[in-house]
A protein has these predicted regions:
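Intracellular coupling helices
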Residues: 4-11, 15, 296-337, 394-403
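Membrane-interface junction motifs in transport/secretion proteins
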Residues: 43-71
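Membrane-helix entry/capping segments
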Residues: 1, 8, 12, 16, ...
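Alpha-helical transmembrane segments
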Residues: 26-54, 357
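Transmembrane alpha-helical interface segments in multi-pass membrane proteins
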Residues: 290, 311-357, 372, 376, ...
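Mid-to-C-terminal secondary-structure elements
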Residues: 82-88, 94-272
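C-terminal membrane-exit region of the final transmembrane helix in multipass inner-membrane proteins
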Residues: 2-3, 374-404
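Hydrophobic alpha-helical transmembrane segments of multi-pass inner-membrane transport and secretion
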Residues: 12-39, 275-311, 339-340, 344, ...
Length: 404
């Protein structure tokens, strides 16, 4: 079938053609960027925490005098350990998806002439890495001598565990064991590498630094107090957490229990990504509504043109055009309109992405989203025009030629 007659017919209906093409262009721009944003949200929700989430709970206390930190830790650990089902209790500064407790800029040289990034750190007492379920991939876990008293925020010259991602960032292609890095006046020596340990408060700027963390073994006391890691069997954990809140009221009645942060790690993760799930749902709804409106627009225009061209269709049928010819005519016509809209929509999609990058720090839109969006809209256009096209192909030649 020749394209020229179809283009000539479209030129006679320029306004309607342009409106549908613009609608498709808008749908293409929104579809590509919305799908990209949904993919980013889903990707962020799949971040690997590196800890045994189903077995861990977190208790956070405040409102106590730092002078009683050692006594408070002892009382709380004893009270929580007495709960049936609790396997171990450890002092820790925070957990993944919990309150942000520690971040620091680090350098590879003591002079700090060049910053090597801002990372988050965890601190915990003896047995904490094992209770967290960290997967060691190189080196060894901290031994008893590595758990030193705090000298300010950190012990003196601590021996630390770092994540594989941070090791690759600091020393790409090198063995990180025995390497040192600095933060202010403290230097840290790497004794082990773990597969994963997510930062406490994951942000939406990308996953590049989501695993830039290190673990500092330390003796509880001072700044390392008031936050506790509970390790229990997954089937007992919810019951244990209820009992733990009640136990705190008995063993430490004068402190404030942070009920917002004191939950299982699984719950903290679920709550942390609640906004992402809601936003993904909203974007899916926007996409569905936009595609529905676009499809209805195509159906409406095609139905109008079929009604308007009944006499022309009948004449073509009378001079030998088959139903297949009529069907293909409307399908090709739709394909041309949709293609024009897609070409403009790809430019709009790129421009919209630049705006989102500037104002919302969204990453650059990968190019493969454009052909995916085009295929979706081509398919939608063909499905939308199919009903009116079949009705046009079913018009009897005699009836059509008699209609005015």
């Amino acid at each position: 079938m020749q394209i020229q007659p179809i283009l000539a017919a479209l030129r006679k209906h320029r306004l309607a053609t342009i409106l549908i093409a613009m609608e498709i262009a808008l749908a293409c721009a929104v579809l590509c960027n919305a799908c990209f944003m949904i993919a980013n949200r889903v990707s962020s929700m799949q971040i690997v925490s590196g800890v045994d989430e189903s077995s861990l709970g977190f208790i956070s206390l405040s409102g106590f005098d730092p002078k009683i930190a050692v006594d408070l830790n002892a009382r709380v650990i004893a009270g929580l350990s007495a709960i049936p089902g609790v396997q171990s209790v450890h002092v820790i500064n925070s957990v993944p998806f919990g309150p942000q407790a520690g971040n620091s800029g680090i350098e590879l040289d003591q002079a700090a002439k060049h910053s090597d990034g801002v990372v988050e750190f965890y601190q915990g007492g003896p047995g904490t890495p094992e209770a967290l379920g960290l997967q060691l991939v190189a080196g060894h876990m901290p031994v008893s001598d590595d758990y030193q008293l705090l000298d300010g925020y950190f012990p003196k010259s601590p021996q630390v565990l770092i994540t594989r991602a941070l090791a690759e960032h600091l020393w790409p292609g090198q063995d990180p064991l025995g390497k040192e890095f600095w933060s202010y006046a403290t230097y840290f020596r790497v004794i082990g590498v773990v597969a994963h340990l997510a930062i406490q408060q994951y942000n939406e700027e990308g996953q590049r630094g989501a695993q830039w963390t290190f673990f500092v073994p330390a003796q509880p006391g001072g700044f390392l107090s008031g936050n506790y890691l509970i390790h229990a069997n997954p089937q007992d954990l919810n019951r244990v957490m209820v009992a733990a809140r009640a136990a705190i009221a008995k063993v430490a009645p004068n402190v404030v229990l942070d009920r917002d942060s004191s939950h299982t790690v699984s719950f903290l993760r679920h709550r942390f990504f609640q906004t992402d799930r809601a936003m993904a749902g909203i974007l899916i709804g926007v996409i569905a509504a936009l595609l529905l409106v676009t499809a209805l627009g195509i159906v409406g225009l095609a139905s109008f043109w079929v009604q308007q061209r009944r006499r022309q269709i009948g004449i073509r049928r009378a001079i030998g055009a088959t139903r297949g010819d009529i069907l293909r005519y409307f399908q090709i016509e739709n394909f041309l309109i949709v293609t024009g809209g897609i070409v403009l929509g790809m430019l709009l999609a790129y421009g919209l992405n630049l705006v989102l990058m500037r104002h919302y720090e969204l990453p650059r839109l990968p190019l493969y989203y454009l052909p995916i969006g085009a295929l979706v809209l081509w398919g939608l256009g063909q499905l939308a025009v199919l009903g009116p096209a079949l009705r046009a192909a079913a018009v009897p030649p005699v009836v059509a030629t008699r209609s005015v």
